[in-house]
């Protein structure tokens, strides 16, 4: 039970990280500054965070799926062992 709660917490935390990295929040331009439509500012730092968040999520999903497949393999082994002992 504790492991499933821990996994759920990790997944929810990564989901929040994922959503915050991909959020499309553009600040409103102040009225007192002129519109610089000719300039194209590069938001390198948010793109870096986005890529970092994507890598973290991919690695976490891979780890969770790998650990779940390992635990499923152990359960199948336990079930097979139980069948042999009942004969």
Swiss-Prot record:
User: Which residues belong to the signal peptide in this entry?
Assistant: 1-23
What keywords are annotated for this sequence in UniProt?
Secreted, Signal
Q: What is its main location?
A: secreted
GO CC annotations on file? extracellular exosome
List the InterPro entries.
Answer: DUF4576
Could you tell me which residues belong to the region Disordered?
24-44
Pfam families named among the record's database cross-references: DUF4576 (PF15144)
Query: Taxonomically, which superkingdom?
Result: Eukaryota
The record's subcellular locations are: Secreted
Name it. Answer: Uncharacterized protein C5orf46
Q: Which organism is it from?
A: Homo sapiens (Human)
Query: Gene name?
Result: C5orf46
């Amino acid at each position: 039970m504790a492991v499933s709660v821990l996994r759920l917490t990790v997944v929810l935390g990564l989901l929040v990280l994922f959503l915050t990295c991909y959020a499309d929040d553009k600040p409103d331009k102040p009225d007192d500054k002129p519109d610089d439509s000719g300039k194209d500012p590069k938001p390198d730092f948010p793109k870096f965070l986005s890529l970092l968040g994507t890598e973290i999520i991919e690695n976490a999903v891979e780890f969770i799926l790998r650990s779940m497949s390992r635990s499923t393999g152990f359960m199948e082994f336990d079930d097979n062992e139980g069948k042999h002992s009942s004969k």
